């Protein structure tokens, strides 16, 4: 494992206070390397820099993923302050940008672009960063409603375990941490598509099959395998309505933040 990953305070805490369910598995593609470790959910810790995400299965046995409105590389180039680094990322990794992003950045950076190339899409599982007053369950409920327009009353979550991910962006050389849960919805993929509204983060939905190839499906299969294990010592349950979990979390957080 990359030396930088060994100094994660979050991972050190999780390993100390939660029973590990498997060894760490690592997969990679041209743009990222992902290391996954499953834990029994005994004493979860999180921060507002750690993404909380959900692998969500539909009533017709598909798994929901999201196609980002902007590529990760575009977001990195826009955020970066160094003009030299902006140009280097653009020239070196142009194919990891969306087609419409390439001419825009070419003009913005004053760098010629001869061939717009093929389309590129970054696919993610729904979720995001928790706000200061949120725990992971509250974060999931809000993010899933915002991103894919599914209400917490239509989602059941398996809170017996969670999977910790190290995501190494091989283009920007950044490392991100994610806590991943598993759940299911009472809606079909067609119902979800009909209710979905494109937003500032998500362009469209993608429905995955567990047998497909690719890094996302490697992670998906790992999480499904972990869900078959006995999560001894866990404080969670195999099937809990997300709405009820959120209500429970809000009551626990109320004294801390002074909610009414």
From Swiss-Prot:
Named cofactor requirement(s): Mg(2+); Mn(2+)
UniProt binding sites for Mn(2+): 147
Keywords: Hydrolase, Magnesium, Manganese, Metal-binding
Active site residues of this protein: 143 (nucleophile)
Protein name: mRNA-decapping protein D10
Organism whose genome encodes this protein: Rabbit fibroma virus (strain Kasza)
UniProt motif (Nudix box) ranges: 128-149
Function statement: Decapping enzyme required for the removal of the 5'-end m7GpppN cap tethered to viral and host mRNAs to allow their decay in cells. May therefore accelerate viral and cellular mRNA turnover to eliminate competing host mRNAs and allow stage-specific synthesis of viral proteins. Acceleration of the turnover of cellular transcripts may even promote the shutoff of host protein synthesis.
Residues annotated as domain Nudix hydrolase: 46-230
Class of the enzyme per the UniProt entry, highest EC level: hydrolase
Protein family (similarity comment): Belongs to the Nudix hydrolase family.
GO molecular function, a single term: phosphatase activity
Induction remarks: Expressed in the late phase of the viral replicative cycle.
Superkingdom of origin: Viruses
Record-linked Gene3D superfamilies: Nucleoside Triphosphate Pyrophosphohydrolase (3.90.79.10)
EC numbers: 3.1.3.-
Residues that bind Mg(2+): 134, 169
């Amino acid at each position: 494992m990359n030396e930088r990953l060994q100094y994660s305070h979050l991972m050190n805490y999780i390993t100390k206070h939660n029973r590990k369910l498997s060894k760490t598995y690592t997969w990679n593609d041209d743009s990222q390397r992902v290391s996954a470790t499953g834990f029994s959910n005994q004493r979860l810790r999180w921060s507002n820099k750690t993404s909380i995400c959900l692998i969500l299965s539909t009533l017709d046995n598909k798994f929901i993923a999201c196609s980002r409105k902007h590529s990760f590389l575009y977001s990195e180039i826009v955020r970066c302050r160094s003009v030299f680094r902006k140009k280097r990322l653009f020239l070196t990794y142009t194919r990891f940008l969306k087609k419409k992003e390439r001419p825009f950045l070419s003009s913005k950076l004053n760098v010629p672009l001869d061939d717009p190339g093929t389309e590129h899409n970054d696919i993610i599982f729904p979720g995001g960063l928790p706000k200061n007053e949120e725990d992971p369950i509250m974060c999931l409920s809000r993010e899933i409603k915002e991103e894919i327009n599914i209400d917490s009353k239509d989602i059941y979550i398996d809170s017996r375990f969670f999977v910790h991910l190290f995501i190494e962006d091989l283009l920007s050389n950044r490392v991100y941490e994610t806590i991943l849960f598993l759940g299911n919805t009472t809606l079909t993929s067609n119902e979800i598509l009909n209710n979905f509204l494109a937003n500032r983060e998500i362009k469209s939905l993608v429905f995955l099959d567990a047998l497909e190839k690719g890094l996302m499906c490697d992670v998906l299969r790992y999480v499904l395998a972990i869900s078959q294990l006995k999560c001894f010592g866990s404080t969670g349950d195999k099937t809990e309505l997300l709405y009820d979990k959120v209500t429970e979390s809000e009551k626990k957080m109320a004294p801390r933040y002074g909610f009414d």
